[in-house]
């Protein structure tokens, strides 16, 4: 998106730096190594502000990367066994988004106070119903696709 904008208006002094996994763009921003970043939704930004002890300005909101539920073992949710293991991202905001996605598929139910994934952050402790007794396994996001053979379901971030 940013490279497209740069092509439309070459007068912009915009240097786009693509980061590899494991690099925290907010740490780069906090240290002054970059002037801005473009990748996160507001709940994640707020979580990062707390973690880094910094306050960042929001110039504009961005799209939210989709999450998907994948499996090498099951073709549909009805074939999911009792005590199935579900890999989810271990970072606060994507973990919450994963739980909301599992709830949307009627695999779990969150405490009713969690109504909007854009404004509330749920954790596994907020699961109030888990009819199949799913085991929620929190894993580093980049490792989740590699875990597909070892888990029943994996919630994977689209980026």
Question: Where do the language-model regions lie?
Answer:
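Short, polar/charged alpha-helical segment
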Residues: 1-13
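Short beta-strand-to-loop elements that line the ligand-binding cleft
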Residues: 13-20, 111-119, 133-139
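Short helices/loops that flank or line small-molecule/ion binding pockets
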Residues: 23-37, 50, 100-101, 122-157
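Short beta-strand-centered segments that line the small-molecule binding cleft or hinge
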Residues: 34-37, 55-61
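Ligand-binding "clamshell"
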Residues: 47-59, 73-74, 150, 155
